[in-house]
Amino acid sequence: GSANKEVDCEAIVHFAGRHDEVFRELKGKLNLKWDLESDEMKLLRVDGSFRVVYSSIGQFVDVTHSSLGDVPEFTEQFYRGQDHWTGRLEMLTGIDVGGWQGVAVADINNDGKDDMYVAQPGGLPNRLYIRKGDGTFEDRSVASGTNFLDSCHGNLFVDLDNDGDQDLISGVLDGIIIMDNDGEGNFTKRASMILPAAVPYSISAADYDVDGDLDFYVCCYNKRPGVNRHHLFARPVPYHDANNGGRNALFRNDGN
């Protein structure tokens, strides 16, 4: 006859859900023994333990409408779908179905509450929303001078001049824009730099030369010239040893 074919295995179990305003999470580990000799698998043994956690909190609640629903600049721009804008704006402005726009968060007017800045595709203005005391927001994109119409993917708030407020570095289609904050959320252009090699997508900051001010590093994506330039992906699309991306850029801050 055939040899006995028994197999031991371990199963990790994790269930989570909400019912009657209570969040329940069940975690456990099961030890199983199966008989594989017959035509159908037979479970010979199961043992293990479970842990159940109950909580009245534990999930995020969508408050987009309650915090931004009364802001006309928000509803008119963000409540419309992608098809609405791609069907009305020229691709030459920089709009694309690919997206990849990010959100930057910082206290830009020094009132102790975080505000948010939303990058937008070309042809649509970036939006700066100031958080008020009741949890709602007001649009200050135009008043702050940050309503760029250039295609934008990434932004970073960082104190570049060590004056105690959050300045803005914005990565737009052609390069970067550096904006000085007056401490009350009003921005003035300090500098702009073209990035000829590639389009900027994200920005990070650190004092890499340990001179007391923050430098910044710009991560880029598609190369600009030649056949590799494309709105969505570089060509070809390698799955390993990728070397067809755009060149990143490191900027040293000399305090001026």
Each language-model region and where it sits:
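Beta-propeller-forming repeat regions
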Residues: G1-N256
